[in-house]
A protein has these predicted regions:
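N-terminal intrinsically disordered/low-complexity leader segments
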Residues: 1-9, 73-80
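Hydrophobic/aromatic-rich alpha-helical bundle segments in the mid-to-C-terminal region
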Residues: 3, 116, 147-194
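Secondary-structure edge/capping motif, primarily at the C-terminal ends of alpha-helices
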Residues: 75-83, 111-122, 172-179
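Helix-loop "lid/cap" segments that line or gate small-molecule binding pockets
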Residues: 98-105, 113-122, 196-198
Length: 201
């Protein structure tokens, strides 16, 4: 008798198939049929969990984004209380960033999917609002840096946060795809590039 999967187990299988397909073939080549075949489930299983492909894609992206946000939340609470010196702040920045970098480098399929989704037509205003909410901890951190460094309040926090996230993710994806030799850049150099706007404003 075939094992019956829970809804969360089915979603996990579908999302992993989406990651693999998007990484291997490009996000525009992902279809419901390919997703079903990729995880060994019949197409009706998908529609029990998601109304359509955009809903599946968006859930896959937001779950990954939430994992990163939760990671940053934990790290920020551990390292940020009581910090009031520039050196301490830069050290905390390195710790937070390093964990994000390790997350990106640990799962190439997920990292490539997330970046391709971000650049695709699937990424719209609603997803952007979720992203702002998920990265509130990082935005608060950037604001703390700004206050310590005397950054003008007119500087857009979201732009700074996006630069950190996007610069780091772009480099990781290029490494996974072979566009950048993984030995050509040290994590410290990638970090310095990602945080260059924040520490030199």
């Amino acid at each position: 008798m075939a094992r019956k999967y829970s809804e969360e187990e089915v979603k996990a299988k579908l999302i992993r198939a989406v990651y693999q397909l998007a990484a291997a073939e490009g996000i525009e080549k992902v279809t419901m049929r390919k997703v079903a075949e990729g995880c060994g489930l019949s197409t009706p299983y998908i529609y029990q969990c998601y109304r359509d492909l955009p809903a599946l894609m968006t859930d896959a992206y937001l779950r990954s984004d939430m994992e990163v946000a939760n990671l940053m939340h934990v790290v920020r609470n551990l390292h940020m209380p009581g910090i009031n010196k520039r050196q301490e702040l830069e050290e905390a920045s390195w710790v937070i960033w390093s964990l994000y970098w390790e997350y990106l480098m640990s799962d190439s399929d997920k990292a490539i999917f997330s970046w391709r989704y971000y650049l695709s037509g699937y990424f719209g205003a609603e997803v952007q609002e979720f992203r702002k909410m998920y990265y509130r901890d990082l935005m608060n951190f950037v604001n703390q840096v700004g206050e310590l460094y005397g950054v003008s309040s007119s500087v857009k926090l979201h732009a700074l946060v996006s630069n950190i996230i996007d610069e780091t993710a772009t480099t990781a994806v290029k490494m996974h795809l072979g566009y950048i030799d993984k030995d050509a850049l040290t994590p410290r150099l990638v970090y310095q590039s990602a945080f260059s706007l924040m520490f030199h404003l």
